[in-house]
Design a protein with these regions (language model features):
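NAD(P)H-binding glycine-rich loop region in Rossmannoid oxidoreductase-like domains
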Residues: 41-80, 89
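Catalytic helix-loop patch of NAD(P)-dependent Rossmann-fold dehydrogenases
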Residues: 77, 82-85, 105-147, 151-152
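Mid/C-terminal beta-alpha module of Rossmann-like enzyme folds, strongest
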Residues: 200-253
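Amphipathic terminal alpha-helices
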Residues: 279-297
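N-terminal Rossmann NAD(P)H-binding glycine-rich loop of SDR-like oxidoreductase domains
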Residues: 3-21
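Adenosine-cofactor binding site in Rossmann-like domains, unifying the SAM/SAH pocket
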Residues: 22-46
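Substrate-binding strand-loop-helix patch
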Residues: 155, 180-191, 211-231, 286
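NAD(P)-dependent short-chain dehydrogenase/reductase
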Residues: 135-196
């Protein structure tokens, strides 16, 4: 029987992926950071030997972009070393590894969508640590699928959508950056894309390599926040927020630099796995329906 070893199973992506895997009838051995600390090499090797999975999916990551600037060692321990340990363990049991990465491996200096072969140039520690993790996986295990994603949000965990909803319930006016452009990605859509890759890996005909995945469409954080509040109000949410003002990144100083342009070309993953990618507006609506309705689509 095929079994997936899933790390980060209680994170915002891992939670949705675990549920979808179970719904699909796919056997899964879920691990949280508490039940498997991926920074410990021997622990990872033992867990993988014990489980003998068909595929490993790594959703575990250090994702606090600003805090990474002062917690560099921890960010690299999780995002580089943890990824390396999982790749080594996967190779030892002849299991492919699917690993989630980020738009932060790029500097955002382009003005056209990023393809997988574009030059990487992270602006901060978080992006550096994630890129280092990618490089370790490529070095240690040819049977890998690396999926970079951007602006991830979901019903679980901490993310931009839930932060905007919280602030909009507390304040009458908000200020949101408008000069950073990208594509929001709903965790449930990314989880569905990962399952496409899992099925190919289980069959033994997975086209290994690096892929880009985000929802269709392009927006700014400012316009995204407008849509969040508008959709939530349309669903009956009693938000106090009446106005959202656009501001420059320079008006909102943060410890870590953000890429100003994080738009992906998704042609490779769409064609390779024959998948349909929903528009971010439709996915935002679906996520808010779940958040307010308490059900999963």
């Amino acid at each position: 029987m095929n079994k997936i070893l899933l790390t980060g199973s209680d994170g915002q992506l891992g939670t949705d992926l675990l549920r979808l895997l179970k719904n699909e009838g796919i056997g899964v051995a879920p691990f949280t950071m508490k039940t498997l600390d991926i920074t410990g090499r021997e622990k990872v090797l033992k867990a993988v030997r014990d489980e003998r999975p068909s595929v490993i999916v790594n959703c575990a990551a250090y994702t606090n972009v600003d805090k990474a600037e002062i917690e560099k060692d921890l960010a690299f321990a999780v995002n580089r070393d943890g990824a390396a340990h999982l790749a080594e363990a996967a190779f030892a049991v002849d299991a492919p590894i699917i690993h989630i990465s980020t738009d932060y491996v790029f500097d955002g200096s382009k003005s056209t969508p990023y393809v997988e072969t574009d030059e990487t140039n992270p602006l901060g520690v978080y992006g550096e640590s994630k890129l280092a993790g990618e490089e370790e996986i490529r070095k240690l295990h040819p049977g890998h699928i690396i999926i970079r994603t951007s602006w991830l949000y979901g019903a679980h965990g901490h993310n931009f959508v839930k932060t905007i909803l919280r602030l909009a319930s507390e304040r009458e006016s908000l200020r949101v950056v408008y000069d950073q452009t990208g594509a929001p990605t709903w965790t449930e859509d990314l989880a569905s894309a990962i399952i496409h890759a899992v099925r190919a890996a289980v069959k033994g005909n997975a086209p290994y390599g690096t892929y880009h995945y985000a929802n269709e469409g392009v927006t700014s954080w400012y316009d995204f926040s407008l849509s969040i509040v508008e959709e939530a109000k349309g669903m009956g949410s009693q938000l106090r927020c009446k106005t959202i003002a656009p501001i420059l990144t320079s008006e909102y100083p943060a410890p870590a630099k953000r890429p100003p342009y994080s738009v992906f070309d998704k042609g490779k993953i769409r064609k390779t796995f024959n998948m349909t990618i929903p528009h971010w507006k439709a996915s935002l609506r679906n996520m808010l329906n779940i958040l307010y309705g308490g059900t999963n689509a």
